[in-house]
């Protein structure tokens, strides 16, 4: 596992479009969330210990913020051929195991990950109602083995600010986790 930080996409960036299949094969796009007050996009996978570590907290965050008109979408861009634990079939199992109530999408070509300049799992992006990036960073300070409870404190603070019509803090700590498992020859040029 290569420990990789987020590239910290510039704040104010417009949400790149996507049209990807969910675990039932339904195509989900950015436009499907047009009426939401905020959109959280999480690049994630099934096997990374950093994602596994926060999955309960991520599932709880979805339960807590869905009633507040917040949408969450998970996107798996890992190479499923070389990492079969991240295959679409295993993603469907992960949705059930983790209790995710949000769409979990498969980015087979890895083009969407590149549009977002995603680097790691988890890599978290929060967009306001105008779909401008207002937060990109860690879920919270908890990491596997550091003894800090998983709370989602950093992302929750950013969500609460957006929902209250306030600015998010400019001090944002990069997310860190396993690198996205790029297909051979498809590695991005932004590293």
Please place each PLM-identified region on the residue numbering.
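Chalcogenol-based redox active-site neighborhoods
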Residues: 1-172, 179-191
């Amino acid at each position: 596992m290569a420990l990789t930080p987020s590239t910290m996409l510039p704040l104010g960036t417009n949400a790149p479009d996507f049209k990807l299949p969910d675990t039932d094969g339904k195509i989900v796009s950015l436009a499907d969330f047009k009426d939401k007050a905020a959109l959280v996009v999480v690049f994630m996978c099934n096997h990374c210990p950093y994602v596994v570590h926060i999955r309960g907290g991520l599932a709880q965050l979805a339960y807590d913020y869905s009633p507040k008109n917040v949408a969450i979408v998970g996107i798996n861009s890992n190479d499923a051929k070389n990492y079969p634990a991240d295959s679409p079939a295993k993603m469907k199992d992960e949705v059930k195991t983790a209790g995710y109530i949000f769409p979990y999408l498969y980015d087979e070509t890895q083009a969407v990950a590149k549009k977002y300049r995603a680097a790691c799992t988890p890599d978290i992006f929060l967009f306001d109602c105008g779909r401008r990036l207002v937060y990109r960073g860690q879920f919270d300070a908890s990491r596997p083995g550091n003894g800090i409870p998983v709370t989602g404190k950093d992302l929750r603070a950013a969500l609460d600010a957006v929902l209250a019509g306030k600015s998010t803090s400019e001090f944002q700590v990069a997310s860190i986790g396993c690198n996205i498992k790029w297909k051979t020859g498809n590695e991005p040029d932004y590293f």
